[in-house]
Amino acid sequence: MTTQSLEAEAKALNDKLESLDLAGRLAMVAGLDGRAVFTTSLGIEDQVITAAIGINRLDIEVATLKTGRLFNETVALVEETEETYNILIKRYYPEKADIEAYVAQYGMNGFYESVEARHACCGVRKLKPLARALEGASYWITGLRRGQSGNRATTPFAEADLERGLIKINPLADWDIETIRAHVAAEAIPVNPLHGRGYPSIGCEPCTRAIKPGEPERAGRWWWENDEKRECGLHVAEAASSIIPNASSAA
């Protein structure tokens, strides 16, 4: 698909999705030609989407990135969610050779030392497994919301991901956190217990802290960096330096 046609399809989808509810948005994507993949980090937004996919038995693959540095609570929630909705959540792991190359170059926790080292860690533990999860997909469904951070304030319902050659679908783009929480309570959706301990946004354990009163939702992610740097690269294009020079290039 050309750049122009990808962008045109994304714009048309964005306009159609806006008037639908969550179930309708997901059903529309599930009915399109091409493979649809939802990647979940098991956060509260993602649990809302997973529940909708499971309850409505939609033809959407659910996948998660097992980085090797997740909270125990997150790991436990994967199996609980599978059992609750009778679905399979496919696990994608980093390559052992990539981890070894990262540790040799930066150290196990080198991500605290520089933005380059942190991006490199995300590249190995998230971006490369993500590439495998999305291989051959036409539509990538995410839990992005406009209220999560300033970087995401203009998130559309559908957008062309030219780098990956697919369309990214953000069915919760217009939901605020209060709506999310009310929906979770009403539908008895299982969520990460860390949300109740001051963690509205949860990533890898070494890179996530509880937020302070009045802080933005994602203030606890990579808190030692400037706000504009606080993305892992899944939803923001990364610099070439994010990939370890001597690491395995296997997808």
Swiss-Prot record:
Keywords: Cytoplasm, Iron, Iron-sulfur, Metal-binding, Oxidoreductase. Transmembrane segments: none annotated. It comes from the Bacteria. The keyword Iron applies. GO terms for cellular component: cytoplasm. It is an enzyme of class 1 (oxidoreductase). Its EC number is 1.8.4.10. Catalyzes the formation of sulfite from adenosine 5'-phosphosulfate (APS) using thioredoxin as an electron donor. Belongs to the PAPS reductase family. CysH subfamily. NCBIfam families: APS_reductase, PRK02090.1. This is Adenosine 5'-phosphosulfate reductase.
